[in-house]
């Protein structure tokens, strides 16, 4: 696959832009994850995932229409290869992967689950170097090491607090992270195959892929005589009070629509391994928000993680 068009686009943009976009995406996603975890415990993981994919898809329709009307994006239909790749990416990463992740949220907590994203940059960076021809210089590797150090610090803190890891929750988190990484890589393949494709168009196709996956899962439960495990979209929605409805909609807007719009834009124009490294700062944001919500004073572990993050981010921008 040729990267000439993508490289040319990246050369015209500020070098720090992909990292700023990824940082914003991480903040949106980690904040929304706290909301998703609460409603997953209260209702069901399948329901929350369906709602967030549906809300994102509905928001993307007018957004893409505005892009077409203003000429910011060409109204070019993606070819079947890119369409299939993005749908597969949505089904695996945004669909099945998020089912495992949200289940892990309910078992391990948001911060602990997001810690496992620390193992994502090395794998994705190497895959990108092998299959996409992207360089992975020593400077970027040093930055990734500092960024992963943030998560090791958080991991140590959580282990000292609990003394153990829940095996099922840990396995679900690992599976979710792996599927999410696969989805990110497939999305990049689709964008490289169709450079004219706008990230929001890709995000919309991914949402449709995820929704299709959820419908299949729901039908599977029905065929097995387990109707209580189906999506039950309207039933659960009607059971929520107005305040709860506003919170879940806010989480869907920030965590699925805005965060992935920012992240897919960064994936399209930036270095895949480095972008993923910045994206793993989500646990830091989640831990900060949890501290504010529960009115707990930030620990020395949090301060140390921030120092490691700032050093790694500085190295990243200099390379």
Spell out what each predicted region is:
Residues 1-47, 58, 164-201, 212:
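Glycine-/small-residue-enriched transmembrane alpha-helix faces in small-molecule transporters
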Residues 17-25, 64, 72-96, 100, ...:
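Loop-to-transmembrane-helix transition segments
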Residues 26-35, 42-96, 146-149, 202-230, ...:
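Transmembrane alpha-helices of multi-pass small-molecule transport proteins
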Residues 30, 61, 90-95, 121-126, ...:
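Hydrophobic/small/kink-forming positions within alpha-helical transmembrane segments
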Residues 39, 48, 104, 116, ...:
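Hydrophobic/aromatic residues within transmembrane alpha-helices
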Residues 42-47, 99-116, 194-201, 261-281:
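Structural motif at transmembrane-helix junctions in multi-pass transporters
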Residues 55-59, 116-131, 145, 208-213, ...:
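Alpha-helical transmembrane segments of compact multi-pass small-molecule transporters, enriched
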Residues 60, 126-129, 138-158, 301-319:
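Hydrophobic transmembrane alpha-helices of multi-pass small-molecule transport proteins
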């Amino acid at each position: 696959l040729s990267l000439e068009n993508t490289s040319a686009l990246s050369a015209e943009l500020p070098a720090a832009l992909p990292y700023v976009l990824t940082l914003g995406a991480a903040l949106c996603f980690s904040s929304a994850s706290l909301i998703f975890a609460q409603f997953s415990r209260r209702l069901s993981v399948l329901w929350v995932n369906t709602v967030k994919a549906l809300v994102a898809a509905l928001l993307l329709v007018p957004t893409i229409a505005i892009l077409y009307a203003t000429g910011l994006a060409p109204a070019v239909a993606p070819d079947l290869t890119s369409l299939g790749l993005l749908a597969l990416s949505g089904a695996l990463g945004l669909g099945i992967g998020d089912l495992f992740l949200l289940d892990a949220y309910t078992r391990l907590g948001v911060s602990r689950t997001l810690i496992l994203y620390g193992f994502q940059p090395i794998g994705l960076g190497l895959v990108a170097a092998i299959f996409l021809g992207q360089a992975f210089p020593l400077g970027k590797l040093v930055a990734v090491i500092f960024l992963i150090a943030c998560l090791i610090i958080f991991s140590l803190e959580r282990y000292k607090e609990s003394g153990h890891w829940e095996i099922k929750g840990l396995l679900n988190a690992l599976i979710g992270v792996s599927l999410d990484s696969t989805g990110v890589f497939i999305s990049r393949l689709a964008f490289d195959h169709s450079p004219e494709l706008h990230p929001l168009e890709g995000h919309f196709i991914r949402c449709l892929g995820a929704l299709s996956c959820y419908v299949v899962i729901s039908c599977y439960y029905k065929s097995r005589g387990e109707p209580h495990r189906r999506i039950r979209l309207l039933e659960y929605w009607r059971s929520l009070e107005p305040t709860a409805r506003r919170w879940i909609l806010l989480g869907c807007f920030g965590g699925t629509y805005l965060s992935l719009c920012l992240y897919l834009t960064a994936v399209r124009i930036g270095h895949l391994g480095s972008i993923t490294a910045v994206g793993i700062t989500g646990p830091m944001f989640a831990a900060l928000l949890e501290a504010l919500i529960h009115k707990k004073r930030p620990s020395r572990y949090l301060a140390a993680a921030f120092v490691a993050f700032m050093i790694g981010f500085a190295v990243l921008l200099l390379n």
